[in-house]
């Protein structure tokens, strides 16, 4: 049995999956915001509860908005303050008495999609999230590749490439990022970035969904904005694909529901790739909000 936990800022979602990777249990509980011991106890109690229910000890994987420090394995996170700076994996292993794996939630999203029936035979899968932020995870041979410092796939914190600056023009905004740097892709390619760029160029704030609706209706500013954004996306995606060369790319997050992306990227990306490279297949995520808990559970698949 595979147990997965999606630990967010407000709730912890638990999921249990059998050997066929079918979900057989679900539970959601509030995330203790400032009580670390209660956070550890909450996770341990869910493990013990479902061990008793299934009559076996499930493997344990956690996905959270952050990562482990490569040197001391403490948690680096902003959205789960109770876990910030704490040795969560070590304390859970001591409490529960078995191995625990922890990964960034974007990596869990990518792993969930990579283990979908249609993608299980693909050698590599790149998951990209175009949501409130922009991030990703890289799956190779069915496993997360997270690198020496657990930051592989953190494409949202690479910088806007020079050809993207040329494309945006001399009036291009230098946007700040939550990581304290400027010019990160997170600030431009996310749903938030989509809105920030519109506000910058047109002097008015609009929600992404309203911009997309206006685009469908042929409103001039929205059409111009979407055209600019699609080319920006193609430039940045091409840079990422050149570095990772994935077989399949899966998009998640709210902006991934904009169907025009799937029409435009295969047409626009090739001119920014090396001449020998082909644009990978780009598809929409199938597992939506359940991707985090699925991927966390699947961290233990061998």
UniProtKB/Swiss-Prot annotation:
<feature type="binding site">
    <location>
        <position position="157"/>
    </location>
    <ligand>
        <name>Zn(2+)</name>
    </ligand>
</feature>
<feature type="binding site">
    <location>
        <position position="184"/>
    </location>
    <ligand>
        <name>Zn(2+)</name>
    </ligand>
</feature>
<keyword id="KW-0067">ATP-binding</keyword>
<keyword id="KW-0418">Kinase</keyword>
<dbReference type="InterPro" id="IPR049874">
    <property type="entry name" value="ROK_cs"/>
</dbReference>
<feature type="binding site">
    <location>
        <begin position="133"/>
        <end position="140"/>
    </location>
    <ligand>
        <name>ATP</name>
    </ligand>
</feature>
<keyword id="KW-0547">Nucleotide-binding</keyword>
<dbReference type="InterPro" id="IPR000600">
    <property type="entry name" value="ROK"/>
</dbReference>
<comment type="function">
    <text>Catalyzes the phosphorylation of N-acetyl-D-glucosamine (GlcNAc) derived from cell-wall degradation, yielding GlcNAc-6-P.</text>
</comment>
<dbReference type="GO" id="GO:0008270">
    <property type="term" value="F:zinc ion binding"/>
</dbReference>
<dbReference type="GO" id="GO:0009254">
    <property type="term" value="P:peptidoglycan turnover"/>
</dbReference>
<dbReference type="Pfam" id="PF00480">
    <property type="entry name" value="ROK"/>
</dbReference>
<comment type="similarity">
    <text>Belongs to the ROK (NagC/XylR) family. NagK subfamily.</text>
</comment>
<keyword id="KW-0479">Metal-binding</keyword>
<feature type="binding site">
    <location>
        <begin position="4"/>
        <end position="11"/>
    </location>
    <ligand>
        <name>ATP</name>
    </ligand>
</feature>
<dbReference type="GO" id="GO:0005524">
    <property type="term" value="F:ATP binding"/>
</dbReference>
<protein>
    <recommendedName>
        <fullName>N-acetyl-D-glucosamine kinase</fullName>
        <ecNumber>2.7.1.59</ecNumber>
    </recommendedName>
</protein>
<dbReference type="InterPro" id="IPR043129">
    <property type="entry name" value="ATPase_NBD"/>
</dbReference>
<dbReference type="GO" id="GO:0045127">
    <property type="term" value="F:N-acetylglucosamine kinase activity"/>
</dbReference>
<dbReference type="GO" id="GO:0006044">
    <property type="term" value="P:N-acetylglucosamine metabolic process"/>
</dbReference>
<keyword id="KW-0862">Zinc</keyword>
<keyword id="KW-0119">Carbohydrate metabolism</keyword>
<feature type="binding site">
    <location>
        <position position="179"/>
    </location>
    <ligand>
        <name>Zn(2+)</name>
    </ligand>
</feature>
<dbReference type="InterPro" id="IPR023505">
    <property type="entry name" value="N-acetyl-D-glucosamine_kinase"/>
</dbReference>
<keyword id="KW-0808">Transferase</keyword>
<comment type="pathway">
    <text>Cell wall biogenesis; peptidoglycan recycling.</text>
</comment>
<feature type="binding site">
    <location>
        <position position="177"/>
    </location>
    <ligand>
        <name>Zn(2+)</name>
    </ligand>
</feature>
